[in-house]
Amino acid sequence: LSIELEKSGALFVGDNAQGKTSILEAVCVLMRLSSPRAKRMQPMVKFDSDQGFGIAGEAEERALRVSFSRGKSVMFIDGEELKTQSEYLQSSGLVVWMGNEDVELVKGSGGVRRHYLDFLCSQIDPAYRVALSRYRRVLKARNLLLKDGGNRDQEVNAYGELLIEYGDLLGSVRERVVSDLLPKAAEVQLSISGSGVNEELGMEYVSGCGGDMRTALETTYESERRQRQTLAGPHRDEVKLLINGMAASDYASEGQQRTMALALKLAQGEILRERGERYPIYLLDDVFGELDATRRNALMNHLPEDSQKLITTTNVDWLSDDLGARLEIEKWSRFTVNEGGVSGG
């Protein structure tokens, strides 16, 4: 599959389960070497396949190419193979992914919010991405030792030291980013809700180790041995989302929850632009069917004019003449997606 996209944006129109999301996901993987729908790339390679898959494209006036096979990834920029993912990511693009499942940011489990933070923090701090990968490996190894149940205290403690090293970095970056997100997301929330509406968004970072990883590991060790898993650390971090001081998951309406999710994603875009000193690409996966006209228009009005926007949708009934004119939609690429095939342009 090969397609050429206008710099301003592109529309991909088609019924559900025709392959629209896979196109946006491919763009995301090319830019960030990761998918917003999966924590790791290897599960995306078929179990019985030795070939894997590859993606290539142009971004930031550079030719990007990546390939993934079982246990291996290869990356090129302008034809030169790069040795590390960090090198590649310094020159590839930034991404904001928006989907109709984003409401889970508000009403879903803490894991959804941690994944949101990981995707954002990894784009603005190269050291974060490295620490996250190492933390996950060490956590898995330590949990295996705890499950073994034998006299492995020395080994468990050694892995604990590594958890402290990587976990402290993850926690400090997450806490700082949540602090930066709050005023931006709160401002967007008020803008979308409209004047006269009393909807104050709040965010609170809650450390999964109480702010002191070493003390937490020492305190919970006996419980860990009984439960055979690591009980403290960034893998237990939480971000509390509040509406007028109350838990948004319990007290916010469905509409308020969707507005909060939009605000969080749009605030993410602002932080990426400020920290990365360039506009991210916005990938909007079938978000308009779940939004009323007010939120739909507010979302499009908040997308930066100079950013590229790729949108999937089952129809364009939501695209009013006024909104189309504002977005200069006539300059966009437009494709029809059917059974994995793409036509138009």
Roles of regions detected by a PLM:
Residues 1-15, 29, 151-281, 290-294, ...:
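Conserved NTPase motor "head" modules and their coupling/switch loops across ABC/AAA+ ATPases, GTPases
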Residues 16, 34-38, 48, 121-124, ...:
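Flexible interhelical turns and helix-capping residues at alpha-helix boundaries
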Residues 20:
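Conserved lysine of the Walker
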Residues 28-112, 121-128, 182, 186-187, ...:
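Nucleotide-state sensing region of NTPase/ATPase domains
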Residues 52, 93-95, 114, 236-238, ...:
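Structural motif
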Residues 87, 91-92, 99-165, 340, ...:
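A conserved P-loop NTPase coupling/switch region
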Residues 285-287:
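Walker B catalytic acidic pair
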